[in-house]
């Protein structure tokens, strides 16, 4: 009987990241899915990224994950959301060619070292108990009754766990239209006393592109050039297309209101739907005063006739969906290729998980993705990569786990929210959830996380080397700017007013001022010429180039440093290019802008890391701490927080209780040290 170090159940976004991560760490990994042809399927919208979500994709990529590389191979329309605001809230987003995205994912998964893929359904686990009476995974059991030995299982069932699809009054057992749901597996989780809940989501009808009147619609042009997600992608090669915008109207709303009683939402009221991605029925009911709602018409591929109307997810009867669609401007003759529907499914209470995403009830069992109550491809991928990493590390008998914190990533924010607060509705990431969002931006995910991944052999040397070159380039550009200095009085003659404190400012210092950019630096120091800002109006994207005029002189000194586009850092060769890469300039400018705030924030983050990372022993008996109420003890015993930081975020745990635990742990540590002396 063959044995695998790690078995991943489910081939969606969480499952693919989990399997690839485990395999990268050298674990013999099995990805088991009910249908190989649907690996990497984009079940809902044909897009990756968005506000906060796009940062997660870059974080996954910084850890050598696969989502960023796949979307770069499939990107057909790219935008930066919130581009007119600060860099901390920029949200890269790309429309995908569905077929190209799935192809890219499958090429990686099906050809990955240490990774086997099998087409099968999993119904049960073989669970035994160790000498301490703790249950642990020994094998999975497939629907055919076959046992596959493993000590680590990552469960990524998406919406398939006892999934039910609803179109009007019609209900079909399915996790996605056309795919069967996982019923036996849901029963297995109940058998092992996992707390299950019910959530729902939905998707809009798909339209035939040839039946839409595009000429009367509002065009939305993407960024030019499109921005890659992966730090290893040099440029997007796919042709770029436009999206279009239309709106519902009063007639549309009358049709919906007249048929609300026929919508699945009318009998699924007790099952919570996504707050931030509501159905059109929910919008019409909740915002009755509004006469229209925006709809984005998104192409599903370059050679695909299907259009995704983002904004009108619904579960109305098919004939009502047709009437509703045809009441909308530009869609008067549009034909529906596939109706919209709602899907309800089981999820587990994520408070039953550690920050590694291992369950507290069964050792070696990990959950990732929508099974934890989240919504979105990106949230699933972020959980998948963490679960896969920790499953592989544990399988290799390594004591350390891999946990990202709120201070260093959006993935850390999400997982911390899930395991400490739980969910009452489908969880979606936003920048507002991150206390330290100034430090965890889309531009610096590699600088935050790639070294961490490389330290555990997760990240390839190619990516690590690229990061080192980038860091060297940033440092040398900063040093160059720090060598240029000016007094407040001299700045006044340049038309720039700052405090007359007599202190000389460097060019790097000046970049932190809100009214000073690369253009101003060029005016102050003529040797920095051709500092250009390009704005395509549609995307409000800034491209900065810096050229040093000194090296353009025929008799330039050979010692002048020049930018090398091939190696990615400064060198002294006369033959190399002198154009500073936009990525490096942008990194320096953003860091300079945020530096005054980051310095203050770093002090808070340092304290949080030191105090909040204080470990709490497994199965710690809180009743031995005097002063804790029975309610506090009950909550702590149930959730079993691994650190003080986790305990602090549990609802109902008072600051006084946290102090009592900290004091007890410190006294205990002191006694142990004294006894061993």
Swiss-Prot record:
Look up the record and give one Gene Ontology term from the biological process aspect.
tRNA methylation
Indicate where this protein resides in the cell. Cytoplasm
Keywords per UniProt? Cytoplasm, FAD, Flavoprotein, NAD, tRNA processing
> From which residue to which does any coiled coil extend?
none
Binding residues for FAD = 10-15
Keyword Cytoplasm among record annotations: yes
Q: Which cofactor does it need?
A: FAD
Binding, NAD(+) = 273-287
GO cellular component, alphabetical, reads:
cytosol
Instruction: State where it is primarily located.
Output: cytoplasm
Gene3D superfamilies membership: FAD/NAD(P)-binding domain, GidA associated domain, C-terminal subdomain
Q: Which InterPro entries match?
A: FAD/NAD-bd_sf (IPR036188), GIDA_C_N (IPR049312), MnmG (IPR004416), MnmG-rel (IPR002218), MnmG-rel_CS (IPR020595), MnmG_C (IPR026904), MnmG_C_subdom (IPR047001), MnmG_C_subdom_sf (IPR044920)
One of the entry's Gene Ontology molecular-function terms is: flavin adenine dinucleotide binding
Q: What does this protein do?
A: NAD-binding protein involved in the addition of a carboxymethylaminomethyl (cmnm) group at the wobble position (U34) of certain tRNAs, forming tRNA-cmnm(5)s(2)U34.
Family recorded in the similarity comment: Belongs to the MnmG family.
Q: How does it assemble?
A: Homodimer. Heterotetramer of two MnmE and two MnmG subunits.
Q: Please give the name of this protein.
A: tRNA uridine 5-carboxymethylaminomethyl modification enzyme MnmG
Q: Which organism is it from?
A: Wolbachia sp. subsp. Brugia malayi (strain TRS)
The gene for this chain is: mnmG
């Amino acid at each position: 009987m063959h044995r695998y170090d790690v078995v991943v159940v489910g081939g969606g976004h969480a499952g693919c990241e989990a399997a690839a991560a485990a395999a990268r760490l050298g674990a013999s990994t099995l990805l088991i899915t009910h249908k190989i042809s649907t690996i990497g399927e984009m079940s809902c919208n044909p897009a990756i990224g968005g506000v906060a979500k796009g940062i997660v994709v870059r974080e996954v990529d910084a850890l050598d994950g696969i989502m960023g590389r796949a979307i770069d191979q499939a990107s057909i329309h790219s935008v930066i959301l919130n581009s007119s605001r600060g860099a901390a809230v920029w949200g890269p987003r790309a429309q995908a060619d569905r077929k190209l995205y799935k192809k890219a994912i499958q090429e990686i998964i099906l050809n990955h070292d240490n990774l086997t893929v099998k087409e099968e359904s999993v119904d049960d686990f073989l669970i035994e108990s160790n000498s301490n009476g703790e249950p642990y995974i020994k094998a999975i059991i497939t629907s055919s009754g076959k046992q596959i030995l493993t000590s680590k299982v990552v469960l990524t069932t998406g919406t398939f766990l006892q999934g039910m699809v609803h179109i009007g009054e019609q209900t079909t057992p399915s996790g996605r239209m056309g795919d069967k749901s996982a019923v036996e597996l849901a029963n297995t989780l109940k058998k092992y006393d996992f707390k299950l809940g019910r959530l729902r989501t939905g998707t809009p009808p798909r339209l035939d592109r040839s039946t839409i009147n595009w000429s009367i619609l509002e065009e939305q042009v993407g960024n030019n050039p499109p921005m890659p997600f992966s730090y290893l992608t040099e440029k997007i090669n796919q042709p770029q297309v436009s999206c279009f915008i239309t709106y519902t109207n009063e007639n549309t709303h009358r049709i919906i209101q007249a048929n609300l009683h026929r919508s699945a939402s009318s009998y699924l009221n007790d099952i919570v739907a996504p707050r931030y991605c509501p159905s059109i029925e929910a919008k019409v009911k909740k915002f009755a005063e509004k006469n229209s709602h925006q709809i984005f018409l998104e192409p599903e591929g370059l050679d695909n006739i299907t259009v995704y109307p983002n904004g009108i997810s619904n579960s109305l009867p098919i004939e009502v969906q047709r009437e509703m669609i045809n009441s909308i401007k530009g869609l008067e003759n549009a034909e529906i290729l596939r109706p919209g529907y709602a899907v309800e499914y089981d999820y587990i209470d994520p408070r039953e998980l550690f920050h590694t995403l291992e369950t507290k009830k069964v050792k070696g069992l990990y959950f990732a993705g929508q099974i934890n109550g989240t919504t979105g491809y990106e949230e699933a991928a972020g959980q998948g990569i963490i679960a896969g990493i920790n499953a592989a590390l544990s399988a290799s008998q390594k004591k350390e786990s891999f946990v990202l914190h709120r201070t260093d990533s959006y993935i850390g924010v999400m997982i911390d929210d899930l395991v400490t607060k739980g969910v009452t509705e489908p969880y979606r990431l936003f920048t507002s959830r991150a206390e330290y969002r100034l430090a965890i931006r889309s531009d610096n995910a590699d600088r935050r996380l790639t070294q961490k991944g490389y330290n555990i052999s997760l990240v390839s040397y190619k990516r690590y080397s690229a990061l080192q070159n980038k860091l060297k380039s940033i440092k040398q550009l900063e040093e160059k700017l720090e060598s240029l200095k000016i007094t407040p009085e001299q700045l006044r003659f340049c038309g720039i007013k700052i405090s007359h404190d007599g202190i000389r400012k460097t060019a790097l210092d000046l970049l932190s001022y809100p009214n000073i950019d690369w253009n101003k630096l060029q005016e102050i120091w003529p040797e920095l010429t051709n500092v250009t800002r390009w704005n395509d109006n549609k995307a409000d994207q800034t491209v900065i180039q810096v050229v040093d005029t000194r090296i353009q002189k025929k008799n330039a000194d050979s010692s002048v440093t020049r930018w090398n586009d091939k190696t990615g850092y400064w060198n002294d060769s006369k033959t190399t290019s002198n154009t500073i890469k936009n990525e490096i300039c942008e990194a320096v400018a953003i860091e300079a802008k945020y530096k005054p705030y980051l310095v203050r924030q770093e002090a808070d983050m340092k304290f949080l890391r030191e105090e909040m990372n204080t470990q709490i022993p497994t199965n710690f008996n809180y009743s031995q701490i005097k002063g804790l109420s029975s309610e506090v003890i009950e909550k702590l015993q149930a959730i079993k927080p691994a650190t003080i930081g986790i305990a602090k975020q549990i609802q109902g745990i008072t600051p006084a209780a946290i102090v009592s635990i900290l004091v007890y742990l410190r006294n205990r540590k002191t006694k142990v040290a004294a006894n061993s002396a």
